Amino acid sequence: MIRYALAACGLLAAPIALATPHDTSDVNWTGSLASLNGATPAAGRLVVQPYVFYSETRNAFDNHGDRHRVTPSRSWRSIAVVTYGITDRFAATIVPSVSRASSAGQSTDGINSGDTSIRFQYMLQAPNADGTRAAFSLVAGHRFAVGRYDRLSSNGFNGGGSGVEGNNFAALYQQWFWLGNGRPLRVRANLGWAPRPGHVSLRGASVYGTGHGFVGAASPGSNVNALVAAEYSIDHRWGLAMDLGWSHDSQTSVHGFDGQGFAVSSTSGPSARWYASPALEYHLSSSVGFIAGAEFAFAGRNSAASVTPQASVVMVF
């Protein structure tokens, strides 16, 4: 009888043992290079993540997806992603940017300020202690056109902005999966959409390829993007990360008059690209981590076949 009673107690205890959360004290994450976090930081928590990007383009994909050589171009860009937890489920992020570019012996006259974005994130479902319950969030953002985009004199590289303000929206997912060796794999998925923002008036040389004396307007297209990402925690110091993403932009049109009064009308796109971003993570502590890797555009249409090494530090306060 005692033996059967003990067996019954064991069966009753089994679900409790299975439900015991995993130990996360030696697990640290920076996040992959491109994905957004499906969970918001705790109320009062500040996360600061500056990035540095170096992009080099020697090839481009044409309208049929074939790769061709183009005039080499290089650019440096830096952004700072600053996120603050307003409540445990609601967070705000601001993303300022600067850049420097060069091609065919011409370059920017110094460092250019780019557009600045803000976004707000609401977490619909919070993760549990060991991350095995998925986190889901919705994001709404806005881009402020603060970077130069036209009246660039004779140097078209001096433009760092788009000239248009626009909204963007995203749905985010994140979940941990504990492997047989006791280490976690964190998976993310992001789906984003930016509707067509409207038109922007242009004068002179601009980031849209217009020349000196041009007067007219540009109408940038909409964007749809998606990615999946995975991070593997090797130990409390090291981790591996990978993004696989896709982005599609609809047509951008430019119309107006050149410096001699002749009508000008052009359309570019639509464009698309597929990219992969492998990276390595290193953590000094639970509040400071580094990630470095590169983004490779391996397929696309009417887009650059660029390679973009990048690095970032994540600081949690």
Language-model segments: what does each one mean?
Residues P21-T24, F53-S78, F157-G159:
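Surface-exposed strand-loop-strand hairpins of Gram-negative outer-membrane beta-barrel proteins
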Residues V52-R58, H68, P96-S102, L124, ...:
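Transmembrane beta-strands of outer-membrane beta-barrel pores
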Residues L36-R45, R89, Q125-A135, W178-L185, ...:
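Short loop/turn motifs that connect adjacent beta-strands in outer-membrane beta-barrel proteins
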